[in-house]
């Protein structure tokens, strides 16, 4: 008798019910994964490839013997759909569930642990029964900052992805508040989508897509059209967007190692100009991409001639200074400081590098470090009035900061003192009450002693 037959013949075993009445949810329709819904979920959406899912489950062998349960650990089990993190049956079965749904799954060995099993709890060629509750699911956080959430409707082909500078052909459909505002086929260069009214979030997502992949992208304002919005499409400032994107084809750009020094220097001049255009247009993320290319091409370039070395240093210095300015605009002050450090490594007395590092440190409340940088600016250029003003601002901000700290600590100490006084008062009251009770006991004791002789008479 096979394990599957055993499931059918086990009276009172829910696995038997699934074996007889379950829906085949496999694409091959080979009855490898059977499902019965025990509690209907809500909504219409089900998990997609790459989604993070949160489930509770009980796992049993077909004979009813339990081998695992998330309930025993008092925490949900979390995995990503379609990434091979769980048995095939789960990737298939859980993908059919709605949020809040509870179902029973019966899984044949080829969709579970196969001939190998998972000893000691799961023997070879075991059919498994699961009760699964889908608690929640979320799209894939592509950049791990919540700004781009991907939900994959269709897998792509192969393992190659477009890189920055790749030429891509895509179909896109953009929605905002339920309204379709853009729908078209378009070809463009990754990192330059803005030139075609495509938000930077699409560029970023394309670098993680495969050919023929179809996905839904939820873009936060930072990766959409930002504070400016997009009047052309009727998009308000700081709007959240939803795009459905299909990557039809792409041709990768040359990697750094495929380019010689001459080509890198020629391309550096081109992308520097592109970066400046984006910066002047307030497209700081796009500008970062362009300036970043210069760094990736030239920072680790060795064996240059004197002329090439001079040109390379000039491009790198400009790139680091411009990146620092972009990061200041993007309020990424730590990155701004790092870029200034790189620039000052090339030119320790660079006025812009010192000034921008001072700006970043002032905004990070590093007042002494900022003041030191502005003082160095004056050593380089005593006529820099902005640096003098910034030194005054450092002193003013430091004083205000210290005053706030003083008030904060004073209030803290006052509260501690009041709390200590209250505790001392409570102790004194408790002691007084205790002494009163003791005195009453002593008085009562003396009264009893005095009454004793009268009792005997």
Curated annotation (Swiss-Prot):
Pinpoint the residue ranges of every TPR repeat in the record: 268-301, 317-350, 351-384
Q: Which InterPro entries match?
A: FKBP4/5/8-like, PPIase_dom_sf, PPIase_FKBP_dom, TPR-like_helical_dom_sf, TPR_rpt
- SMART domains assigned to the protein according to its UniProt record, in alphabetical order: TPR
Q: Which GO MF terms does the UniProt record name?
A: heat shock protein binding; peptidyl-prolyl cis-trans isomerase activity; protein-macromolecule adaptor activity
Modification N-acetylmethionine occurs at: 1
Q: Does the keyword Nucleotide-binding apply?
A: no
**Post-translation: what modifications?**
Acetylation impairs ability to promote interaction between Akt/AKT1 and PHLPP1. Deacetylation by SIRT7 promotes interaction between Akt/AKT1 and PHLPP1, leading to suppress Akt/AKT1 activation. Ubiquitinated, leading to degradation in a proteasome-dependent manner. Deubiquitinated by USP49, leading to stabilization.
Q: Which UniProt keywords apply?
A: Acetylation, Chaperone, Cytoplasm, Isomerase, Nucleus, Phosphoprotein, Repeat, Rotamase, TPR repeat, Ubl conjugation
E.C. code: 5.2.1.8
Domain of life of the organism encoding this protein: Eukaryota
Family matches, as Gene3D superfamilies: 3.10.50.40, Tetratricopeptide repeat domain
Q: Which residues carry this modification: Phosphoserine?
A: 445
Q: List the catalytic activities from the record.
A: [protein]-peptidylproline (omega=180) = [protein]-peptidylproline (omega=0)
Q: Which residues carry this modification: N6-acetyllysine?
A: 28
- Subcellular locations according to the entry: Cytoplasm; Nucleus
Annotated region Disordered: the residues are 1-26, 421-457
Q: Where is the signal peptide?
A: none
- List the record's Gene Ontology CC terms alphabetically: cytosol; nucleoplasm
Limits of the PPIase FKBP-type domain = 50-138, 165-251
Q: What does the subunit section of this Swiss-Prot or TrEMBL entry state?
A: Part of a heteromultimeric cytoplasmic complex with HSP90AA1, HSPA1A/HSPA1B and steroid receptors. Upon ligand binding dissociates from the complex and FKBP4 takes its place. Interacts with functionally mature heterooligomeric progesterone receptor complexes along with HSP90 and TEBP. Interacts with NR3C1. Interacts with Akt/AKT1 and PHLPP1; enhancing dephosphorylation and subsequent activation of Akt/AKT1. Interacts with IFI44L; this interaction modulates the kinase activity of IKBKB and IKBKE. Interacts with IKBKB and IKBKE.
Q: What else is known?
A: The relative resistance of squirrel monkeys to glucocorticoids is associated with a high level of expression of FKBP5, but is also due to intrinsic differences between the human and the monkey proteins. Human FKBP5 has a much lower effect on glucocorticoid sensitivity.
- What is known about what this protein does? Immunophilin protein with PPIase and co-chaperone activities. Component of unligated steroid receptors heterocomplexes through interaction with heat-shock protein 90 (HSP90). Plays a role in the intracellular trafficking of heterooligomeric forms of steroid hormone receptors maintaining the complex into the cytoplasm when unliganded. Acts as a regulator of Akt/AKT1 activity by promoting the interaction between Akt/AKT1 and PHLPP1, thereby enhancing dephosphorylation and subsequent activation of Akt/AKT1.
The entry's protein name is Peptidyl-prolyl cis-trans isomerase FKBP5
Source organism: Saimiri boliviensis boliviensis (Bolivian squirrel monkey)
Q: Which gene encodes it?
A: FKBP5
